């Protein structure tokens, strides 16, 4: 309910799922329509974590890309390629194959995303570890190096987990519509998800958090904020404040409240207080929540505003 600022997954408030559950619990809920029992959760977690490895030929597949390729370009290619590696789960008329494809996508996409990141910075690929949680495993695959032991941080792991939960579902958005449109032609699940990722790439959709960080870099200094606020209010100026307002929510984005709290937890844990981008973001946040123009037009900070800052703090480059 965009007018009331409410988001439910299968009838459960997003606040409840993000605070008390983990991402795989939300996955189970979205797939099966009900929250799992303790045994069902344990079985589902084990099923996902035992399928995190990808075909070894994917390593060679990555070497066909330039190192400076945009990660979304790489992900579109990798997801499409999954249908070439996993022929036994592409028949959409078979419910069992559809579920196998779902499990493979949930389990292997973090591995492929981490490989895309590692390839872009010239580091060795890191194999997944099934004894770690879903989010901890992803962070380890992204940031561990062979020459030293990687230690998981519970605060950062929880932040990553919340980011996954908050982005798991959001009604009939552009990428969901794209996946369903591709699926209506009878295309296999991997091809459909690849199409959805291509749509997600756009700055008006999933690319908004990257665009938000680039905007903060463009502003450059807290002193220049009034200049950019004035430009945002000028109808004749093409400049737009990224990370504010939402097409669905005419009230505060419920995901933004959770992400705001998570963002500050991460920054406190990492003792980040002198980041100029963060200073700009905090000042912009204050203005947006108090300036009559923004309040009247209900241009509150959205989930992309906080997730971009959080991901940057976790160590992910803007691009």
Swiss-Prot record:
One of its GO terms (biological process) is tricarboxylic acid cycle. Pfam families: Citrate_synt (PF00285). Pathway: Carbohydrate metabolism; tricarboxylic acid cycle; isocitrate from oxaloacetate: step 1/2. One of its GO terms (cellular component) is cytoplasm. It catalyses: oxaloacetate + acetyl-CoA + H2O = citrate + CoA + H(+). Signal peptide: none annotated. GO terms for molecular function: citrate (Si)-synthase activity. Its EC number is 2.3.3.16. The active site is at 246, 304. Keywords: Transferase, Tricarboxylic acid cycle. It is an enzyme of class 2 (transferase). Disulfide bonds: none annotated. Citrate synthase is found in nearly all cells capable of oxidative metabolism. Belongs to the citrate synthase family. NCBIfam families: cit_synth_I, PRK05614.1. This is Citrate synthase. It comes from Bartonella vinsonii (Rochalimaea vinsonii). The lineage of its organism: Bacteria, Pseudomonadati, Pseudomonadota, Alphaproteobacteria, Hyphomicrobiales. The gene is gltA.
């Amino acid at each position: 309910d965009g007018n009331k600022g409410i988001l439910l997954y299968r009838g459960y408030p997003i606040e409840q799922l993000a605070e008390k559950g983990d991402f795989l619990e939300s996955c189970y809920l979205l797939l099966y329509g009900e929250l799992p029992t303790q045994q069902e959760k344990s079985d589902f977690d084990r099923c996902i974590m035992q399928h995190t490895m990808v075909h070894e030929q994917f390593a060679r597949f990555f070497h066909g890309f330039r190192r400076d390729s945009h990660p979304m370009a790489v992900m579109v290619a990798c997801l499409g390629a999954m249908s070439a590696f996993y022929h036994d789960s592409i028949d959409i008329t078979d419910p069992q194959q559809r579920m196998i494809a779902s499990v493979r996508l949930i389990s292997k996409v973090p591995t492929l995303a981490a490989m895309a990141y590692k390839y872009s910075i010239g580091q060795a690929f890191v194999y997944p570890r099934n004894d770690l949680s879903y989010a901890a495993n992803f962070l380890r695959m992204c940031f561990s190096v062979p020459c030293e032991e990687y230690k998981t941080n519970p605060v950062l792991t929880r932040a990553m987990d919340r980011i996954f939960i908050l982005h798991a579902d959001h009604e009939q958005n552009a990428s969901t519509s794209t996946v369903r449109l591709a699926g209506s032609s009878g295309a296999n699940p991997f091809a459909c998800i690849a199409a959805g990722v291509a749509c997600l790439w756009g700055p008006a959709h999933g690319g908004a958090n990257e665009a938000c960080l680039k905007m903060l870099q463009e502003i450059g200094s807290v002193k220049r904020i009034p200049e950019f606020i004035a430009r945002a209010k000028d109808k004749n100026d093409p400049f737009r404040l990224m990370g504010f307002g939402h097409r669905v929510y005419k009230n505060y984005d419920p995901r933004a409240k959770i992400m705001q709290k998570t963002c500050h937890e991460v920054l406190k844990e990492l003792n980040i207080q002198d980041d100029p981008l963060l200073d700009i973001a905090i000042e912009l946040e204050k203005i947006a929540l108090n300036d009559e123009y923004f309040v009247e037009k209900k241009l509150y900070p959205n989930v992309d505003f906080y997730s971009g800052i959080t991901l940057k703090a976790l160590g992910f480059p803007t691009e």
